[in-house]
Amino acid sequence: MPSFDVVNKIELQELDNAVNNVKKEIETRYDFRNTTTEIDLHKGDLRITVVAADEMKMRALEEMLHAHCVRRKIDPRCLEFKEIEATSRGAVKREVQVKEGIAKDVAQKIVKAIKDSKLKVQGAIQDQQVRVTGKKIDDLQDVIALLREGDFGIPLQFVNMKN
């Protein structure tokens, strides 16, 4: 039976490139000269630490990060910005969690949307992904179109199409 997987994967190298491009832009921009501004990617737990002199510069850094992620074909919806915290040096700090994989509640919404479509396919939750199987590839392509139209709060990729 034909099947495919619905996943939410981040290309880690592209994310690293986006963060490095933001670092380069910080070095060249006039408004960031002589300020405490840092951005670091922690690959182990998929988070980005952003430190800026004040909240205005923090917003500018967020916009730069969004722009560079889009240029690198990373959907900005996978970035979850935490609360802004004050540091001991008078600067502000913010953690950005990178969401990868499909959470259980989002996977249930995806399976429910597939069932509500009345197509002859089945959706099954497998760890951090959803496997969709059906008798016809045309039905699977209709499911892909349906899921692209829906808003589940995370970027979805469709991989491993088997015939």
UniProtKB/Swiss-Prot annotation:
The UniProt entry, under Pfam families, shows:
DUF520
Q: Which residues form the signal peptide?
A: none
Record keywords? Nucleotide-binding
Q: What cellular component terms from Gene Ontology apply here?
A: cytosol
Tell me the InterPro entries matching this sequence.
DUF520, UPF0234-like_C, UPF0234_N, YajQ-like_sf
GO molecular function annotations of the record: nucleotide binding
Q: Which PANTHER family match?
A: UPF0234 PROTEIN YAJQ (PTHR30476:SF0)
Q: What does this protein do?
A: Nucleotide-binding protein.
Q: Which family does it belong to?
A: Belongs to the YajQ family.
Q: How is this protein named in the record?
A: Nucleotide-binding protein DVU_1981
Q: Which organism is it from?
A: Nitratidesulfovibrio vulgaris (strain ATCC 29579 / DSM 644 / CCUG 34227 / NCIMB 8303 / VKM B-1760 / Hildenborough) (Desulfovibrio vulgaris)
